[in-house]
Amino acid sequence: MKFEIMNENHRDKVLELSKAFYCSDALDHEVPMNIIETNIDAAISGDKGLIGFVFCEDNEVVGFSYVTTYYETEVGGICVQIIDLYVNENARGKGVATQYFNYLFDKYSDAKRFRFEVVKDNVKAISLYKKMGFTDVSYGQMKIDKI
């Protein structure tokens, strides 16, 4: 498995995978197509603080993820926020997510925390994440959208 920084050549495949991801049970709400396209644009341009990664197997993109980093005062250092993680159905069960997390741990070896969101119903993903050492965050989050 090879992990690459998302670029313009990946756009069409990431859009295809994004449509599958954003319609899956990994989310608890719909995401409009214009937002999906904006996310891809931001990741490819690299100027919005969003980094896109694609997962390639035999020169085929089989998954994608977005990452952003920020300073987390609770740990006194950088937090890597994994935003979206999708592997197509044909590539699941082959350790892609585990390999990706290990790739991120190496790439961001100076980070003090790695964090992401997962819906409570995604039992298989939660089981994997716990096996890797991730723990639940005991407090909720709040938001206000200004889209």
Task: Give the location of each predicted region.
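Conserved GNAT-fold acetyl-CoA-binding loop/helix
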Residues: Y22-D41
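Conserved GNAT acetyl-CoA-binding A-motif
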Residues: F101, Y108-V118
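Conserved beta-strand in the GNAT
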Residues: V54, E60-T69
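Conserved beta-strand-loop-alpha-helix junction that forms the acyl-donor binding cleft
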Residues: R92, R115-I126, K143-I147
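Conserved acetyl-CoA binding element of GNAT-fold acetyltransferases
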Residues: G77-E89
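A short helix-loop-beta-strand connector motif used in the catalytic cores of GNAT acetyltransferases and
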Residues: A42-V54, Q81
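Conserved acetyl-CoA-binding loop-helix of GNAT-fold acetyltransferases
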Residues: V87, G93-D106, S127, K131
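A short beta-loop-alpha structural element at the N-terminal edge
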Residues: K2-E16
